[in-house]
């Protein structure tokens, strides 16, 4: 699972909040659901952060076709793979310009040095920029790229070679993902010289379709069109604005009033109302997502399998789906969605059985009234439109078996930061696939390598991990399916998570919005989008 000067009449903050934006024909306002934690895509894993940075400001060597999962050329115009699958040679697109802003003015075009800086910074903890601005790259390590990439070199200004330690069947797809956005080496050098390395996360410079202008947390982000963009047909807006509001009801009001043209994460209960509005249209598609609970297996008593089994079978999932998803969710029984190849349809939930759950807790020596902290997101996600209500229903279910759940919430950025540090007992989370490969689920969310990243269960099972790693090394689809399905069986037996639902994705917008495409990866891209006059 992130916009730019308006006409003068709208520049005042008061007018920005109350006047319809329709009068600024080339300005699109997106009512977004949360503030990004920053603008350096390598540091994050959520759609909120990627929408505000990777999908607007940056490009990658490869990219996914808009609205699809097929990989196409990006900053690399072409590439070759060696016969042994260990060497990738990328030929870079010439003439690509980095953004010119009031805080950076590039003196050269994009070249191989920028690719080297981007990935060497991620690979090397001792890299000068990492020393000046220490930061984690959770997705990069979750994907195992820190181990699979042996070296990066350039043969000339427009040719880059990646040498791998081991075959990675999804390497080209991985480079199309948001976290692999290419940074400017020249800008990084300027920041180091100025002693402001941290600005890479606050004042982004990229080659993407929109140029960052300014950001006011919990209020708005402004971007201008990149008129020097290497793919000019994708830039059809003059200005882009993210108007941030965590309240779905407020976002709906603003959409209906014309104060924004596109709105994120609607409440399921509002969908029919939106469809009845003659000024709105609602796009939808089956979600490539999963809403789930992650049990922190390093915290007692969740380190006991019987406790996790008890909590899992005590949850009335159909009731949650009815109340929270309101017809837009499907019961999830596996740790990845049905649309993902290698999905094992034979895997089923343990029956809902509070009595057996109580017995398991007794066998595990758990006393009546034991308290567990249950974390709930404060923002809506495609995978869970109302985490707070979900938590309250789970709290009630667990209360029936003698477990007291204390619901804990934080602002989104803090929620993610603390969860990666392992402060939670149980957390509500969700994931939308990023590249169409099973490893994006079974490796990124549940592997040993991801324990410090997006594996919020902090679960590391050697037998499971061996299967996932073997599958990643194979280029034989049938062999990968066999290995991944074996891994799914282990994961279901060990209960590091409780799958809750796969949800339908709805994207409401005003009818003047043209050529918007829903991303199968849960992102909200605005390149290629226009407004009817």
Identify what each model region corresponds to:
Residues 91, 123-188:
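Surface-exposed binding/hinge segments that line
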Residues 195-201, 227-273, 391, 404:
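Ligand-site clamp/hinge motif
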Residues 35-52, 75, 102-106, 169-181, ...:
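A structural "hinge/loop" feature
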Residues 26-32, 52, 169, 216-220, ...:
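Detector for C-terminal structural segments
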Residues 31-84, 120, 127, 205-207:
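N-terminal lobe/hinge region of extracytoplasmic solute-binding protein
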Residues 210, 296, 302, 331-364, ...:
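Structural transition elements
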Residues 65, 224-228, 287-310, 314:
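A bilobed periplasmic-binding-protein/Venus flytrap-type ligand-binding module shared by bacterial periplasmic
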Residues 77-129, 161, 301:
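Aromatic- and charge-enriched surface segment that lines or borders ligand/interaction sites
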């Amino acid at each position: 699972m992130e916009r730019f000067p308006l006409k003068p009449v709208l520049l005042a903050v008061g007018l920005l909040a109350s006047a319809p934006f329709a009068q600024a024909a080339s300005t699109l306002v997106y009512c977004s659901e949360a503030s990004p934690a920053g603008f350096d895509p390598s540091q994050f894993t959520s759609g909120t952060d990627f929408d505000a940075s990777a999908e607007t400001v940056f490009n990658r060597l490869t990219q996914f076709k808009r609205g699809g999962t097929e990989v196409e050329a990006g900053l690399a115009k072409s590439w070759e793979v060696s016969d042994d699958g260990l060497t990738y040679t990328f030929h870079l697109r010439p003439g690509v310009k980095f953004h010119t802003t009031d805080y950076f003015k590039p003196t050269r075009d994009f070249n191989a040095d920028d690719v080297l800086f981007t990935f060497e910074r991620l690979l090397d903890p001792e890299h000068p920029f990492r020393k000046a601005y220490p930061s984690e790259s959770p997705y990069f390590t979750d994907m195992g790229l820190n181990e699979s990439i042996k070296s990066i070199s350039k043969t000339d200004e427009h040719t880059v070679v990646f040498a791998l330690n081991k075959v990675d069947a999804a390497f080209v797809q991985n480079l199309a993902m948001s976290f692999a956005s290419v940074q400017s080496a020249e800008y990084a050098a300027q920041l180091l010289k100025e002693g402001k390395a941290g600005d890479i996360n606050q004042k982004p410079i990229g080659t993407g379709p929109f140029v960052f202008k300014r950001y006011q947390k919990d209020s708005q982000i402004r971007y201008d069109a990149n008129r020097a963009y290497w793919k000019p047909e994708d830039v059809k807006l003059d200005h882009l604005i993210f108007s941030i509001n965590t309240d779905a009801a407020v976002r709906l009001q603003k959409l209906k009033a014309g104060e924004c043209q596109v709105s994120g994460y609607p409440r399921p209960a509002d969908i029919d109302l939106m469809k009845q509005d003659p000024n709105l249209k609602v796009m939808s598609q089956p979600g490539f997502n999963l809403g789930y609970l992650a049990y922190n297996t390093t915290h007692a008593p969740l380190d006991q399998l019987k406790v996790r089994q008890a909590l899992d079978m005590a949850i009335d999932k159909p009731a949650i789906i009815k109340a929270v998803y309101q017809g837009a969710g499907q019961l999830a029984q596996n740790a990845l969605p049905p649309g993902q190849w290698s999905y094992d349809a034979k895997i089923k939930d343990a029956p809902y059985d509070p009595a057996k759950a109580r017995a398991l807790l007794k066998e595990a020596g758990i006393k009546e009234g034991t308290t567990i902290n249950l974390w709930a997101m404060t923002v809506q996600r495609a995978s869970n439109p109302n985490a707070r209500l979900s938590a309250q229903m789970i709290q009630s279910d667990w209360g029936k078996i003698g477990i007291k759940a204390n619901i804990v919430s934080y602002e989104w950025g803090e929620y993610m930061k603390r969860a990666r540090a392992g402060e939670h007992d149980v957390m509500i989370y969700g994931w939308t696939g990023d590249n169409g490969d099973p490893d994006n689920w079974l490796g990124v969310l549940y592997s040993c390598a991801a324990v410090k990243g997006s594996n919020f269960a902090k679960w590391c099972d050697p037998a499971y991990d061996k299967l996932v790693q073997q599958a990643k090394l194979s280029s034989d689809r049938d062999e990968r399916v066999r290995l991944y399905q074996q891994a799914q069986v282990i994961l279901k037996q060990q209960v590091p998570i409780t799958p809750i639902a796969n949800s339908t994705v709805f994207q409401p917008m005003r009818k003047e919005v043209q050529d918007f495409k829903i991303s199968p990866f849960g992102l909200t891209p605005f390149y290629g989008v226009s407004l009817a006059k």
